[in-house]
Structure formats: structure tokens, C-alpha cells
Amino acid sequence: MEVTLQLNCSNIDFNNVCEILKRVGMGYFDGEVHKKAFENSHSVVFAFHEEQMIGFGRAISDGAYEAAVYDIAVVPEYQGNGVGKLIMESIIQRLSHCNIILFASPGKEPFYQKLNFRKLKTGMAIFVREEQMHSAGFTE
């Protein structure tokens, strides 16, 4: 399967980004909010198969030594084919000089561990949607 990666937001349908996030069970907002988030990110990756968006991800960074990965999603029927790995490798390559953190969806930790991510012992967060994050298994 041939996958093409796009490393910018040109001609991206952010309503489709919302639909993919819904399909994979991740949090989502309206298209304009996601457009703002991706356009203001340090690194973005959109994966396409035959001109159809099948996945994406992004990272925010200070560009010096810290970065955080967000919104890694692959359409369910394309999961398990290396698409997520391609997206993550593209992001990691551009941030190789940085410490990189992320929130893994519960159950997806092994995927990130294969990419050399390790669980944090002291990670903490303040969430706008605290109850939702707790019920989804992100917080104690």
C-alpha cells in the first residue's frame, strides 16, 4: 500500500479531520478549531492513500528542547498497516533534538513503546474536560 505524507496544512479538509477523530473515538472539536490547532503546531503530518486522508498527527514545540505530540489518528480500516508509525517517525525525525511527550489513548501504549516512548512516573495535567478525561481512563 502506497502512503503519501503531506507536511503542511494546504488544502486540508478539517471537517474530515473531525470525522476521523470521531471514528477512532478521540476527542474532537469543530473543523475551525482543529484548523487553528494544526496551523499553530510546530510539525504536522497528513497521510493519504489514493488521495484519501487516512491519518494525521501533529506536535507543538518550543523548537529548542521540548515538544508534545497530539492528535495521532489513523482511520480504523488502515490501522495495523504502518500508517501510524510513518506519521510518528516523521514527527520524531523533525523533533530529534527535543524531549517529546504525549498522551496515549488507553490501550495504545504498546504502539508508542515500540517507538521508544516510556511511561512517565510523575506526569500530571489540568484538563478543561476533567470528567471526560477521567472516564476515558486518562486520569486517576
Give the ranges of each region predicted by the language model.
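Conserved acetyl-CoA pyrophosphate-binding loop and the N-cap/start of the following alpha-helix
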Residues: Y78, G82-I87
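Conserved GNAT acetyl-CoA-binding A-motif
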Residues: Q93-P106
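Conserved catalytic-core motifs of GNAT/GCN5-like acyltransferases
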Residues: I101-F103, Q113, R118-A136
